[in-house]
């Protein structure tokens, strides 16, 4: 596949080629000129995730099926969506750039989601997400789904930041009827497996080699408050160094047969 995913802003053009399993990308990307941080790779990861999803859609069609995800189908927008730390900063900056009154409306929806979590007695458990084991990720994902809290970016059952939605949202594809996603029926949901996860590419940044967890992630519903309370103190490096590390992360994926609702993001643990 050929294409030209472009991170926002001007930079140095670079030819990029990625091959992982059945996915092959060859195109031109634009890297920042000055030293930068992993969060600056988010636009590139979003574009690459789109390319991988399109490739998967063609593969599914060739097999006589079709991806059933479409506008207005928002069942997965009530899942516990995982975003990388880089994406949490990206979403925070995105909301801060929104004009009023829209910025206030989005922030109020985040506040309402937080109130509902607190009323349900689930907020404290959710705030402990960095310590969760793989089993807890699944169990608490189920508990979160039962609350049916819509994503704060959801408006009229459609994503209001569709062009900037998280990588995990782009990588969650199914061929089964929407009602199975609504009930989070793992036995009935037919997920589309992807040969590469760009969520992992972002979420591996900052993970020590000896760490138990494979990824650093944040619940989307807590992304804004997390970004506010965790200033990005990552040391700036050359964009080419960051890109090389990002590409290396893509080879660290632990493939699964299908997505694992209702926790969307692909986080696993070494010793769950």
Question: Which stretches of residues belong to each language-model region?
Answer:
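Short loop/turn segments that flank or connect secondary-structure elements
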Residues: 1-272
